[in-house]
Amino acid sequence: MNARIADLLYNYLGRPPSLSEYHMLKLQHRNIQKIIAFNKDIFISLIKKNKKKFFSDIDLTSSEIKTSVLSYFSKQRDTYSIGKLYTIIELQTILVSTYTDVLGVLTLKGPDMFPSSTRYDIKSIKQIATSALHAMNVAVISDKVMGRHNVSPLVSNVNALMEEYLRRHNKNCICYGSYSLYLLNPEVKYGDIDILQTNSRTFLIDLAFLIKFITGSNVVLLKVPYLKNYMVLKDKDDNHIIDSFNIRQETMQVIPKVLIDNIYIVDPALQLMSMFKMFSQIDRLEDLARNPEKLTVRLATLMEYVRVKYGIILNGESNHMPMKGVLDKDKRIIDVDTSGYNFSFKKCYVYLDESSLSSDILDLNADDAVDFENVSNSAYLINGDVLYTYFSNTILLSDPDTIHEISNKAMSAHILIYQILTGNDIRQPLSDLVNSLMYNEKVLIHEVIPRDKKTGKHGIVDIEKDIITH
């Protein structure tokens, strides 16, 4: 045994390391040095300040917080499983290396905020949005309750923290969804704050520790296999606290953004395209049937933004929108005619199975596919005059051989997402797609083509049980 490392392990474990502990943990000696040298008093002070600023309603004393922190940093002393020791070291290392910069900094005075004057009045456009959603309100409500509807009572506290976090870390964290629309239009109601960031796992682990230390309760971090780079934080009752998608820095750079009150939001034109896509998912249409007013305000806000930004005249002239698709049910591929627009491709093959797209891209021997991760939920490839892509939602049919207009709009929006993220001009097709929302009749759904079935195991980070699975 190396005497210096053995002494370090003795200091950390509070006991002489066994032979197996020594050999398994000796390569962790640098991380262990960081943990031992970490100033717990300063850390406890930061936790208390975070509690005072964002969780003041939580009934836990300063003494209890200190006990909780010190207890976790000595947890290894009563742990003899090598696997659990590895987990404790990994989580403690994340905490001592990142917490101050990620969440501790939120207790300091921030930069001056310059309130945005960008606010949108939706009175004139709300009737158009109402009519559009009335035509799309064709789903039969099921009794299934989606997990996203089980909300933790901690959400309001975390939202307050997230507002500050988005301002301090606006180079690597942006928001989208209802909160971003609330910044444009205070009529929009929001629940949790939806975010994209480049260090999602680190942030959520730090937040999990903060919640653990100031509430005394365990929270669990889950990685969902069928959503790309998605993690969700849940409380002890399995209620949703916050989720986050992780994206690469290069993806972050190509996303068009709008700065409002020192917070970057995903450009509402891109969000409108995502909303078009969302309506092709049958359970989202059930949400529409349950609460049409909530979605009406959101759709109207997005429509008003793009109307103003792109100078769109709302007259119902939709030209080639939505672009029509023809479904091959056996191959689960849709052939969409895009020739009506000046794109760099004449048609688009929309795959309903991601593995089939990946296989065909390999067969094409093409190496210039672009993947915008969960921003588009698909890779895109142009080969010849064809755009190849994958569509992750259900496809609705209005009769046995005809794709429903809702899904045609969704696929058209998916194609425009590619145009937006690659910096191409979208003014005319966007204008046409928005105008295609007008003067529609309600058409019932004949059949739902199921979405791609993803397989895989949930990953988990459980601080209390010392578990990390990938």
From Swiss-Prot:
InterPro entries in the record: PolyA_pol_cat_Poxvir, PolyA_pol_cat_sf, PolyA_pol_nucTrfase_Poxvir, PolyA_pol_nucTrfase_sf_Poxvir, Poxvirus_polyA_pol_cat_C, Poxvirus_polyA_pol_cat_N, Poxvirus_polyA_pol_cat_N_sf
Keywords of this entry: ATP-binding, mRNA processing, Nucleotide-binding, Transcription, Transferase
Catalytic activity: RNA(n) + ATP = RNA(n)-3'-adenine ribonucleotide + diphosphate
Pfam families per record: Pox_polyA_pol, Pox_polyA_pol_C, Pox_polyA_pol_N
EC number: 2.7.7.19
GO molecular function, one term: poly(A) RNA polymerase activity
Biological processes annotated in GO: mRNA processing
Function, as annotated: Polymerase that creates the 3'-poly(A) tail of mRNA's.
Similarity field: Belongs to the poxviridae poly(A) polymerase catalytic subunit family.
Subunit: Heterodimer of a large (catalytic) subunit and a small (regulatory) subunit.
Protein name stated in the entry: Poly(A) polymerase catalytic subunit
